[in-house]
Each structure stands twice: as structure tokens, then as C-alpha cells.
Amino acid sequence: MSYVKRIRQPIIAVLGHVDHGKCLLPEERVILPDYGPITLEELFNMTKETVFKDEEKEVRKLGIRMPVAGVDGRVRLLEGPYVWKVRYKGKMLRVKLKDWHSVAVTPEHPFLTTRGWVRADQLKPGDYVAVPKILPGKDDKEKFLQYVHEKLKGKVHIKLPSSDEEWETFFYFAGTIFGRENSVNPEGLTHEVKALLELFKVLFEYPREVLRVLFMAPVRYVANFLRGFFDINGYVNGEELRVEVRGAPHEVLEELSLILLRLGIVSKIYPTSLAISGRRNLELFRRYIGFSEKQKAKELEGIIRRSENSESYPIFEELRRIRLLFGFTRAELSSTIPLYSKYESKEAPSYEILMKILNTIEKGSKDLNKKITILEGRVRDHEYIEEFKREGLIKDGKLTELGKELLEVWRNREFDSRDVNYLRNIIENFVFLPVEKIEEFEYDGYVYDVTTETHNFIANGILVHNTTLLDKIRKTNVAAKEAGGITQHIGATEVPIDVVKKIAGPLIKLWKAEIRLPGLLFIDTPGHEAFTSLRARGGSLADLAVLVIDVNEGFQPQTIESIEILRRYRTPFVVAANKIDRIRGWVIEEDEPFLMNIKRQDQRAIQELETKLWELIGKFYEFGFQANRFDRVQNFTRELAIVPISAKYGIGIAELLVLIAGLSQKYLEEKLKIEVEGPARGTILEVREEPGLGHTIDVIIYDGTLHKDDTIVVGGKDKAIVTKVRALLKPKPLDEIRDPRFRFDYVDEVTAAAGVKIAAPGLEEALAGSPVIAAPTPEDVERAKEEIMRQIESVVISTDKVGVIVKADTLGSLEALSKELQEKEIPIRKADVGNISKTDVMEALSVKEENPKYGVILGFNVKVNEDAKEVAKAKEVPIFVGNIIYKLIEDYEAWIKEEEEKRKRELLAKVTFPGVIKLYPDERYVFRRSNPAIVGIEVLEGRIKPGVTLIKQNGQKVGTIRSIKSRDEFLQEARKGQAVAIAIEGAIVGRHIHPGETLYVDLSRDDAIILLKHLRDVLEDTDIKALKMIAQVKAKEDPFWRAV
């Protein structure tokens, strides 16, 4: 069948250096449920496994759960896979929130504000920044008791509390001690109280470990601790309607504020006091903590009754967005919420009012259908039309872009309770506090950061964020709605060509270029480890790659890894030479094309850039590539184009986008032509479970069109899965009305190139990195199954031969790792996709018994199951895991080398080396005839050591060398040509041995095998001669020695 062809947008992957300039000072703290509060420096030093290291930075594997803001707006515990240490010299900013903590960050580190994510150097006093309302702790009694027993081991001999009630009493007591700042006079105290006091001192190591213990202890124990503290130090301020702690040291107040977050209570910190106010906080205080003293408890009830409101939420734009999404005008809401309009402009609504607003909005507008007909022009209603004009939906009698968009949203009912629930989650989990001041200072030293799945974490009780390389391109969509807008796909970001033209319009005109591509599709999972997963028909899914190199650091290990991968997959690429803004004296003009920006620079800065570019060009030449600055390239098929950029400031992004578009169009046009209506082909990026949908696959479609209800064939664990598409989901476009954070659009079809989530039965066993093929007919299904099984069988290995066990996260990365191992002639017993299991360890153990060198497991981008860890540790099976293929293999090869050296050292320690000696014929060199015999000898061949047995020419044993002496010095060894005296235990001169006689070191068969098979490289010529001489002697009695 013949289908219409058109050019699709090219698929672009980003590899190489990850721009990681967003860091914090070493002393900034994160709070981990398993460890309590810990500075970033301590967190880094606590981890041992280095993933990457150079002169400027070090990345270590972390694998510890920590509080983050989840995509649904809730504070969650998610694993932070990596922690960074980066060398930094330059400006730092300390952001201090009003009546709260501060945090010191590099200028580009973003904070979540009511205006979205804002960089530290763009914050100003008065901006509102997100602070978590709750910090989850451990809340696991068994783990806490384990921690207590471990801590007290050998330190204190008292009976520990045995029940919850006793522990709660102890924590209450500890809180009172903390409230008195540990100033308790033990005189006159009972034995029981003294014991509790001793337990307090050891467990809490006052004041150092208080916060840690309180984040590891069950929350009810924490509540009792706080009650004890507030009973001693707490007051009810009836005038200000708040609970206060007065006169405590500021450090204690800061610790206390973080402890209160475990219960969802946000306090205010003043120089010498702490206050809890607002109805929500006071009610939580009463529920969890309260006062034991009746008068204070009564006063607390009084201020709660008089407190009408809780925290305020100045989320004016977000309120307008969700109101319009659900079809309300301001006037409509004002009938239910008095004076509603002020909450979108000047007065931040309190928690209580905001909840009332959201409850009203969630019910939807009764007049929505009427509003649709008005926007469609079918009905005229003067009042609504005037409202729509004020809202910016109608201008000059026509619908604006916003009006058109809302009409589509209302018609399709693209909103439901989940939109409201996201905002509820934000309000329940965060408060927004104003920036009080921002201090700037110079810093020279190490800074730290943590990588998390959601690109954010909580430091010093403040939410901070780190970004990806695509952020700068995405940001260009702000105020570019009329240009079509950058849209988010599953696993990809689409940049329409209109946006490229908007960013790079002047350049396109200057170069007289015509771009016919519909856009660019950037894969959202940058890095070489993701690239290896992007397979399509045996090659790379990516049509083109951007290799990002820090122009100041030059080639790094990940650069070399990326080049090798690009070469292996024959993927064309361009080079982005990043961080030109770090060149001394570089003049920055944000979002400016490089060719315009360079005209602002002085000669010295230009020369420095030229030098750095020539260094890069030289390195590329070493790897077999001709390279040049992009505007100097004569032939793009023969020369690599290097675009100097600053991802941080947007300099050179215009040229990069135009170059990608131009090269794709000129050289990849035939590849980009797809059959629009042809059956779809794609690659699975990820398999994940979605609430309400079951197991789904995130897929990049690179050919054809996929429809709902299509039959698809998908690569599975050990089979091809045939299933039917139940739903196709794409994220909502990134615009001001829809909320794309966790919402999907259900669509009937998707055309390449696109990222899509597929919901279908039976996807539990689907393999990341494997193909997805649409199959319209039964014959197509069979062909697709055969094709997919061929691909899987070519990568997944299962044999009985001696070899390593290989595990990877996707089919593509498994293939890449296996190829590298095969090229290095490292045999593979088993290669499969998935985490490392106990079965893998047992398989490696069976190999280890045959050949220890190969009894190992290599894992790329995978985790090790707990039971597998335990068995591997017990059976001493080495497991190597990492996310850089060559580094993984390097680590394994280094281990082999170390093991061989260790084995060699062990063999050297126990093996007997060959040696032949001759007693001097002169009787003067017989120093003692027996017990032991001491004689002068010369080593004729080989070597001798104390402890070796000597034999005669006829094979008869004559005794053992007890010691070797040269003049006044005892030796551990004597070699060929040395004249020494030796003491021989068991020999009598004149009976067993005689002056002038030749004696041989007695070797066993095992000695000979070890020497010739395992230690051949350490044997010298004289050792070989000695071995042959000994073999001749021993061959008379044992035929084995004839072969030596």
C-alpha cells in the first residue's frame, strides 16, 4: 500500500556535559528520615562510591530518600541518586526569608515562588518563596529502637522504656530538659530520674543530636517531646493570638522550627523568640502538642476561637488560571465569595478563604454552555461580552488567542477535580514566605548539590531546585503563545518551527535560509546512558545529537564516552561549547545570538575563547574528526560544527537551533520523510504504572501514525507482546490555562515524531528500549513478532559458558554494554534487562567456582535488590554498578588486575621457587657439621629462601635451610651468583652432604604448575634453568617432571 509522505521533525538527543552550576554552601542542611539533619558536605562525605571525578567536581552515588516536592504538589520522600561536589569561585547569594531560615546558593539556583521558578539572582525582597508545611520523618518504631540500641551499645547500662507509654513519658521528660537547656541539678533526684537524665544525655548528645533523634523517632514520641518543651518554655500571647517561646538561644529556636514541621506546624522565628499563629497552625498545636497546665490549655482554646484565618497565599495568577479553566467570571465568584476580585490582584486569600474558593470552582459554572455559545458568536449577551473583554478573551470584536484556547477547553471539558486537587495539594503542603533580604558575597571553595527525580529538594526548610539543559530553550516560550508554543510530549519536548523562527529570526534572514521542518523534538532524558536506550531498527532513535562540552574544562570522560556512542550508532552531531560566560571579562547580554554577542567582547576575551576552541578542535582531531567554529565550516558533511554558547544566559542558543534545523533539513531530509498514514513504529523509553491506567509505556513514535484501538506488538522480557491500544495520552500543552504537571490529553491518534503514553493490557513485562510496531493485519502481527524476537535474541544472552553476568535498564543499554565487553573479549554468560536479583548472584557464584575472574555482575543504570545484596555480601560475589559504560568496564578491569595482583601475592607467599646450589669444596667453608650444619655455598641458578628443603642428585632429601647469612647479615633470599653461608636443619656434613656437592631445592608438582601457569611472568631466565635442572633430577622417579 502506498501512503502520502511528509517530512517529520527530527529527533534530537543531548549528550555530554550536564550544566550543573546550581549549588549550595557546604554547611546548608537537608533533613533525611534515615539520618536526621545533615549538612551537604557531611552527606557527600558519608557516601563512598564515586561515579565521576575530575579536577573541578566529583559526583557520588547517594541512593537515599529525601523530602522533595512531587509532581502532584505534595511533599514526598523520593530517592536522591547522586550528590555533587563542585569547585566554585565567584558570587554567592544568601536568601533570607522573613521570620524564617536562610539558604546560601549560587546565583543561578532557582526557588519556587508565586511567579514560578525564579533564579536567586532574579529574586527581590518581597517575592514569596515556597516553604514546606510538613517534613516527613521516619515514623518506624522498630528502626528507631534499632538505632537506640546501636547508639547505647557499651555506653549506658540502664533499663530502656519497654512500652509506647514509657517511651512517650521519656520523650516528654527529654523535652522538659531541652526546655531548661540541659541545666538540671542532679542533686536530690531519684535513681529513676537520674537514669532518664543519663539516657537523655547519651541518646540526644545534647544539643548536637536532638534534631536527628526527633526526625528518626515515631511522630507521637516527637509530640510528647514538644509538649514537655512547651510546658517549660511556652506561653500563650492573648493579644497577638499566638503561642510563643521566649528567651531561648536563636540556634534552639531554629532547630525547634524544623521539629515543628514534622507535625505540619509552620512557626515564625524572631531573634529571641518563636511564635505559632494562624488558626490552622494553632489547631495542629492543640491536636498534637497542647499544654499539660490547665490554665495554658484554656488560654490556647481562647486564642484558637478568636483566630479566624491561617496563612495567606498570594497566588493571584494561579487563581485566575483555574477560575478561567472552570469557566467562571470574576462577577460570578463574587456572588459566593464576597469581594472576590481583590484576591486576584491585591489581597492574598487566607487558607480558609482559598479552600472555599476552590470548593466553589470545583463545582463548575452553571452558565458554561451559554458562555460557549457567546464565544462561538451564536448568542449575544452584553454583560458577558463586557466581562470577556475585561478578561482578554475578546478584542476588537474577535476572539484573542486566549479566547480561542478557552473555547476549546470549555467545549472539550478539559478540566476536572484533579486540576483543583493539585492546587489543594500545594496549599496543604506549602506556605509562601516573603524574601526579607538577599546578601551577596564572594566565595572560593567547594559547593554541593543533590540530584533528585523531581529536580528539587528541601534545604534549611526552603524548597530549592536544579534545572536541565533544555530549560533555556523551554523558557523562550514565555510570551510566545501566538508562535504556537513549545509543547511537552511524553519523554520529549517539541519546539515548533515558529518558535525557532521567533528566537532566531534575524539569523534566518541574514543567512537567507528557508526552514521547511515542522519543528524539533528534543528527547527529555539527556546523557549517554539514556542515548543507549534509544534504539530504532538496530541504529539510534535520534536523528541528530548535540554534544555539550564545557569550553573551560574541555574533554571529560563523559565526552569521550558520548563520542564513542555517537560513532557506534553513526549519529551525526553538532558541538555546543558551553559556559563561554565563564571566560574572564566576558560581556553578557541574555538571549543574544553568539555572532552579535562576540562583537561586544574585548580582544583578550576573544583570544581566550579562540585558544579554548583550538584546544577542542585539536582533541577532536585525535578522535578522527575535523572540527571548526560553526561560522567557519566550509563543508558540514566533513567538518564538525562547534557553536559557542552560554546555556545559563541563552547566548548562542539561536545559532544552535538554526544549525540543528538547517543540518537536519539539508542532510537528513530523506530519513525524515515518513508515511503519514503508515503503521506506526516507535521505541519504548520507560515502562511505568499509572493510577487508574495500570502499566503503561512511554514511547517515542518515529514513523507512521498510531491510532487508538490499533493492534501493537511490543518487546517483552522473553517474548513479543501482542496487545491493543486502549488509550493514547499526551500531556497538556505548556500554556497558561492548562496545567501540564500531571494531566494528560486523551487523543485518538499520534503522528511521528512524537512522544506518547500508551495504555494497553499486558504491558507488565514490556522492556524499555524495545520496539513498538503497529500491526494492522494478522500477517503484520506475525512479521512484527519475528522482527522483535530477532532484536531481543540478538541482545539478551543466556548460556552455560563461563562468563560475567550483565544487567541493564533497557535493551539498548544492554546491547551497548554487551558490545563493549565482547570487543574487549570478556565472555558473557547471561545478559538481561532488569535490576540485579538473587538469581543473578547465584548464577555468578556458580561461575566464580569455575573461574573467580568472571564470577561477577556488571549492572548499568540498575539497582541491586536487597536479597541480592545480602547473598552477594555473604558469598563475596562482586557487583559493579554505574551509569557510564566505559567506567563500569574500567572498574571491572581494575578489579581483575587487583585480584590478579592479590592472587599473585598469595601464590608468591606460598610457592617454592627453584634453586640450585654448590657447597664450596674447601673444608674451611664447613663452619659446623650438624645441629644444624652450617656451610658456605654459591647459588648456581635460581634462588633460595629459608624454609626450603634440599635434595641430592639422586632425589634424596638432605634437610631444610633454616637461615641464610652474608657476613653479619641474615638474608630472606639469595640469588644466582651470591656466595653465602646457610644453616641446614637435619643434615650432617660428611654423612648426608659433602663439600663440593651440588644440591637442589625440592619442588612439588603444585609448585611447578603454579610457577609455569600463574607466575611465568615473574620467573627470570635463571629460575627457568634451575627448574629444568630440578626436573631432570625428579624425572628419574616421577614421569610428570619429564614434561616440565
Swiss-Prot record:
Family the entry assigns: Belongs to the TRAFAC class translation factor GTPase superfamily. Classic translation factor GTPase family. IF-2 subfamily.
Domain DOD-type homing endonuclease stretches: 173-265
More info: The intein interrupts the GTP-binding site.
Species whose genome carries this gene: Pyrococcus horikoshii (strain ATCC 700860 / DSM 12428 / JCM 9974 / NBRC 100139 / OT-3)
A GO BP entry: intein-mediated protein splicing
Record-linked CDD domains: aeIF5B_II (cd03703), Hint (cd00081), IF2_aeIF5B_IV (cd16266), IF2_eIF5B (cd01887)
Gene3D superfamilies reported for this sequence: Hedgehog/Intein (Hint) domain, Homing endonucleases, P-loop containing nucleotide triphosphate hydrolases, Translation factors, Translation initiation factor IF- 2, domain 3
Function: Function in general translation initiation by promoting the binding of the formylmethionine-tRNA to ribosomes. Seems to function along with eIF-2.
UniProt name for this protein: Probable translation initiation factor IF-2
Residues passing through the membrane, by range: none
A matching Pfam family: GTP_EFTU_D4
